[in-house]
Amino acid sequence: MLPFSSKLLITNVFHYINDNIFSVLLGRFYTSQDVGYYTQANKWTNMGFSLISNMINGVSQPVLVETSSDAMRQKNIFRKMLRFTAFISFPAMFGLALIANEFIVIAVTAKWQACVPIMQILCIWGAFVPITYMYSNLLISKGKSNLFMWNTIAQSLVQLTMLLCTISQGILVMAVIYT
């Protein structure tokens, strides 16, 4: 149990670092106004995909663990959950990207309109986040915390390298690379 759990702990530490490194780099190389625009866009995007992800994860993990002994059944259930997740996530997040300008003006006033392009990029990325969480739950339910950990570490290192290479290109390019 300890080897499995320790790998999940390491994975969660990398997730935490990876989730916060972008803001740290923005604060170091850009103005506080630019960081504020990114933070505002990220806040609204996170609310959107977190609502969907939390709803799906609350159901998927127990179901996938319960069906882990029957690979064919788990595969069929996973496919159904994946379709359902895409059915909810894509219209919600792409819709939020489409109405981002109006949403920002209504929610936090027109002074934050500069965050709209960043929010649109993050919303497109956010449509896929619940699906990646589904695959993570599948790996964990199959007891493959080692694969999950190394995948997360590799992804984090690639993202950090790409961010460092694109710092001079601007926040929009960094947001595309980071997502």
Residue locations for each model-derived region?
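Membrane-interface helix-loop junctions in multi-pass transport and translocation proteins
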Residues: N146, I153-T179
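Residues that define the loop-to-transmembrane-helix transition and helix capping
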Residues: Q33-G36, R79, Q113-V116, S145-N146, ...
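Interhelical loop/hinge segments that connect adjacent transmembrane helices in multipass membrane
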Residues: M1-N20, Q33, V59-N76
